[in-house]
């Protein structure tokens, strides 16, 4: 559809049902205006006399399974109504031009930027190039396009702005050049490749899968090449509950070293037993060997491994609780997951700056506010 016709259809209400499905009835007018503004921004940059389409990829919140995916564990995650949207149109130049609101335009020659930089710089052009490279390596068709994006998935907020961006690039390439035939899990795997190899961040697969698949999902990464995804048919909002994400004023965008230490330390414990990841290790063998591990490995690494095993069990229990509609059991394990994350995983604040503990303060205040109510609180990722 031509860009101008796309805008007319949007403002004429032809997409209201879809907008209501994604954002809720009350947000339709606001979102209609948001998409129309994105079309106007695209036209100002790239022109109106061309074919185009609209795209949306949601951010995600982790409900349980904090830092388990990279050791082939289990997670529960939910897509949220904060998302990145795009207006995109193919071109015949093998050039990708992408302007994100508030950022400089990325311009990438897909026949030139085909391998990772010697030292990744953490720039968005690396994610785009990584997605193109991943598509090629998997035998999919790639090509140039022009796109404008705008997002309310805040950078560094723990709701996976980078994963949503990667999945967005994948969806554009999928629908423009591959007839939409690539499934969302495959796009998520390519997105993880882009972030690991081109962007230089050692993430697991949970963020990308949760953003790509949508809804509430329980994911088992025991075989990361074929994760088992259980889409949970549960309407927590319909039960009278909302997920609220507190902006503590911090930012984890510059904490890559802290982030990377978690899988590194967990895998170092697994390596002692000749295993690549903790999922392949029997918990009983690990616990029995703690006296031998102390001195060889840091106490923090041991604590993080203990967190992994407990968290993996919690996810299984919470999955069954959600299926049964047992919110009491689910909430109890959400709180237990948060305590384990704080005490044993130790990813609530950085040891590089102990003076700043916005998350710790928010958790303390949340507990004071919500204790003795049918509610729960935790750090939701990072």
Predicted ranges, named:
Residues 132-155:
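Glycine- and acidic-rich phosphate- and metal-coordinating loops
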């Amino acid at each position: 559809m031509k860009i101008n016709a796309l805008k007319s259809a949007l403002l004429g209400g032809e997409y209201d049902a879809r907008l209501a499905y994604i954002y809720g009835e009350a947000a339709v007018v606001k979102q209609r205006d948001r998409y129309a503004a994105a079309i106007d921004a695209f036209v100002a940059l790239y022109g109106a006399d061309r074919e185009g389409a609209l795209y949306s990829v949601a951010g995600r919140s982790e409900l349980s399974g904090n830092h388990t995916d990279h050791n082939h564990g289990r997670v529960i995650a939910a897509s949220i109504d904060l998302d990145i949207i795009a207006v995109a149109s193919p071109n015949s130049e093998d050039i990708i031009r992408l302007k994100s609101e508030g950022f400089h335009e990325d311009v990438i020659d897909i026949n030139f930027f085909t391998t990772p930089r010697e030292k990744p710089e953490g720039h968005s052009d690396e994610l785009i190039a990584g997605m193109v490279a991943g598509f090629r390596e998997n035998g999919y068709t790639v090509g140039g396009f022009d796109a404008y994006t705008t997002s309310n998935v805040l950078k560094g907020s723990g709701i996976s702005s980078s994963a949503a961006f990667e999945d967005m690039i994948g969806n554009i390439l999928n629908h423009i050049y591959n007839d939409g035939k690539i499934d969302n899990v495959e796009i998520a795997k390519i997105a993880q490749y882009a972030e690991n190899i081109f962007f230089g961040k050692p993430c697991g697969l949970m963020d990308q899968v949760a953003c790509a698949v949508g809804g509430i999902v329980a994911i088992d990464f025991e075989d990361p090449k074929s994760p088992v995804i259980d889409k949970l048919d549960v309407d927590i909002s319909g039960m009278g509950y909302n997920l609220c994400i507190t902006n503590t004023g911090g930012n984890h965008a510059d904490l890559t070293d802290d982030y990377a230490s978690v899988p590194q330390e967990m895998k170092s414990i697994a390596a002692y037993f000749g295993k690549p990841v903790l999922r392949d290790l029997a918990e009983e063998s690990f616990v029995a060997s703690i006296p031998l591990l102390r001195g060889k490995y840091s106490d923090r690494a041991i604590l993080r491994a203990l967190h992994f095993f407990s968290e993996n069990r919690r996810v299984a229990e919470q999955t069954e609780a959600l299926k049964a509609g047992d919110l009491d059991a689910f909430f109890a394990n959400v709180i237990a997951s948060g305590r384990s994350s704080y005490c044993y995983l130790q990813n609530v604040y950085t040891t590089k700056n102990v003076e700043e503990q916005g998350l710790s303060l928010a958790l303390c205040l949340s507990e004071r506010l919500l204790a003795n109510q049918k509610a729960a609180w935790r750090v939701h990722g990072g």
